[in-house]
């Protein structure tokens, strides 16, 4: 049996079903393939090279290919942006995501990507800091508070845990105090800040770009 129910594929603008149908040709013997998906088709939101793979096989491959950074999100008020940040972390190769504070979070924006990525829960900012320090990671906050450093001119630690706050209030004071540094995205417009999901995507992409360049 597959690791998740195969839903009817969403319909795109051309009227065609997304995903792929049943496997055509000789059935592969590679254990990464899911017999049920091979027989019925794969409508999941996964990259083409993961089509027909089991969920466990995808998770293991993502662990192997992940970059040496993690992401943490303060969940103090059930922010709807958390799902979007988790999805971006999956797309850009984060090794792990931590939900800090409330255990329950809105998964809708994650588009099921949290099933393939290691997502855990920690009760507090201090618990996150303790976990990261014990594994050699450095907390790097992202917020436009006094004293924050411009992202474009700041060299981030390779093994950073990028920490994002809530849409309305940003990072908590406790979290800021625990961060090695806090970076901000330079802006030119009139708004004081951008959406936290968008800001997270920019910071993660920039850090992932530099880490990927080191591996080339």
Q: Can you say where each PLM-predicted feature lies in the sequence?
A:
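Post-transcriptional modification and biogenesis factors for structured RNAs
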Residues: 1-216
């Amino acid at each position: 049996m597959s690791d998740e129910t195969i839903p009817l594929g969403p319909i795109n603008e051309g009227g065609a079903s997304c995903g792929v149908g049943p496997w055509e040709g000789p059935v592969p013997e590679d254990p990464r393939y899911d017999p049920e998906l091979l027989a019925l088709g794969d409508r999941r939101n996964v990259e083409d090279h993961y089509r027909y793979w089991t969920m466990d096989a995808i998770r293991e491959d993502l662990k192997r290919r992940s970059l040496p950074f993690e992401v943490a999100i303060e969940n103090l008020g059930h922010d709807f942006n958390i799902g979007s940040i988790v999805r971006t972390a999956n797309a850009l190769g984060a090794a792990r995501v931590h939900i800090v504070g409330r255990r329950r979070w809105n998964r809708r924006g994650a588009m099921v990507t949290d099933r393939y990525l290691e997502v855990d829960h920690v009760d507090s900012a201090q618990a996150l800091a303790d976990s990261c320090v014990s594994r050699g990671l450095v907390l790097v906050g992202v917020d436009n508070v006094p004293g924050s450093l411009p992202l474009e001119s700041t060299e981030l630690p390779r093994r950073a845990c990028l920490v994002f706050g809530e849409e309305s209030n940003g990072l908590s004071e406790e979290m800021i105090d625990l961060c090695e540094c806090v970076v901000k995205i330079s802006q030119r417009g009139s708004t004081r800040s951008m959406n936290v999901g968008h800001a997270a995507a920019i910071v993660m992409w920039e850090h992932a770009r530099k880490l990927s360049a080191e591996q080339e």
